[in-house]
Amino acid sequence: MSYPATNIRLLITHREADESTIILAEGLAALPDFEVYMTREGIASAVVERGVTYLPSPPITGKVNLSVCRLLRRYMRQYHFTHTYSPGSSGLSNALLAILFSTVKNIAYRGTGARIRRTDPTYYLGILNPRVHHIVCETEHVAAYLRSFFSPSKLTVATKPFSLPWADEALRSPIELPELQGKSLRLVMVANNRGRPFKGLHTLLEAMLLLRDDRIGLTLVGDYDEQERLFVQSSPIAPNILFLGERPEAMRYMAAADVYVLPSWRDASPRVVREAMSLSLPTIVSDIPGSRDLILPGETGLLAPAQDPEALAKAILWMLEHPDERRAMGRLGRERIARDFSPERYTEIFADLFRSLAV
């Protein structure tokens, strides 16, 4: 759909902009009909980087921060913004207060399907505020939940992007582990598991114990609870599992694997699955919202019911017994990242949305 050319002046309010938000800001700033501004802590005056104007701001914390609201209001008068985009809840509530009695359109972001309570007044400072013109949802699952609160026309699904060049360096220099040499199937899981049983590490370890197959090796990158290591240490599968702890170049360990496994009970939209797909790794993920929205079951990976070691073991065994098919899955996964999760596509979705709201 085409919209009339309009000079869109966009302010992005966020305490700590993540990589996806910066990519979005720079992508929009490169378009001829956009001027993009973003709040940033720790600078004394406005600076321009890659087309984005960064405006000094104190930390945007709390639902109502009067100093932030006054500053945003001053920026509104100075730069004549037409839209604000708020990827975080504090940025959203303070931006909504700042645009009172103005025609500025506010766009919010929702990355989780966590319950919204109509009886909780704090939600009306943010996502339930009637001055929120549109909501960008991280996944279709999030959008489906929000349809019980909002018209579908008020919702857009835009899953955060991943750029293939980010993975290419890891592919050029994978970290091979001598302990896994000779294994027919090298699994990898990258996650911060300590104090997070919902990441499903124990389910994966139980699946490995059910298999008891010396042809299969598992590398665990990230922190973990000590009882998980002790569980493995006292089992017959101990030689097949490596607890590496936190490592700065996790993708290089992933690049040396054959299959990525994420057995979470819950997850929003795990970036690590996109990383794995960009590395041409087939994936085994839990059949839960978020993870299952990223893969194409049977094409780029397999689904297994959450908290089901037997089903997970079956999926791992399938990967072991079908090496050609799993490699084809990996290639299709990388193609899916390039096609459906590119920064260019992500920017295009937002550009079309902002233009439509300017009409």
Predicted stretch roles:
Residues Y85-L92, R110:
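Short His-centered aromatic/hydrophobic patch
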Residues I107-C137, F149:
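A conserved, positively charged/aromatic
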Residues T13, E179-K199, L205-M208:
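Conserved donor-binding/catalytic core segment of Leloir-type glycosyltransferases
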Residues E19-E26, G195-L210, R274, E310:
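A conserved mid-protein helix/loop that constitutes part of the nucleotide-sugar donor-binding site
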Residues P282-V285, I295:
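Short hydrophobic beta-strand element within catalytic cores of glycosyltransferases
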Residues E246, W265:
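Aromatic "clamp/platform" in nucleotide-sugar-dependent glycosyltransferases that forms part
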Residues P297-G298, L302-P309, W318-D324:
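Conserved acidic donor-binding segment of nucleotide-sugar-dependent glycosyltransferases
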Residues A311, W318, E325-D340, Y346-D352:
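A short, well-ordered alpha-helix in the C-terminal region of glycosyltransferases
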